[in-house]
Amino acid sequence: EVVGRLRPTAFREFWEFTVEKVAVNAVMAGARPEYLPVILAHAASGVSARSSSTTSFACYSVINGPIRSEIGMSDGIGAMGPHNHANVSIGRAYNLLSVNLQGGSEPGDTYMGSLGNPMNYALTFPEAEERSPWQPLHVQRGFKAEDSTVSVFFGGRYHIAGFGPRETWAEQFKRAIAACQHNLPPTLIVDPITTRQFV
């Protein structure tokens, strides 16, 4: 049974694939069997983790709902780094299936990112729903709190910033946001400790 299809560029044919093909890539990524529902959701999204654009934009994904804790994902210290097996191997599986099940990701042929992007490797993390002052992303998008979801985003550039002393950070933050392209609004990934400053 076909569970998804991907292609490296808009000018190439789609490749269709089965659960077995997705599972093979999950095993190659070091994923445990209990991660497969999340990896299958990535595969079924139809969005490749490997874009073919000279801007080198990359995908990242946010996991919501009960599955986050059921499979041991981390939304705390090091959640976006190489420290949690579930976070990293799910992201790596998404990357591998995007290469192997879409017809390749060959630089100069099916991959045209000029310099590439380190975010292409494995950026998957859960939202810290319990520590956020806002509704979880999936609830904002119309899902129930008890639903488990995968949301895939594209990002061209990324900026990791600390905005200095408490007295001046708000003004510096406003300037940083104002510098973003208006037709490409930013996605803010904010530590739960910092969110208290927003509410």
What are these regions (language model features)?
Residues 1-199:
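Non-transmembrane, aqueous-exposed alpha-helical and coiled segments at domain scale
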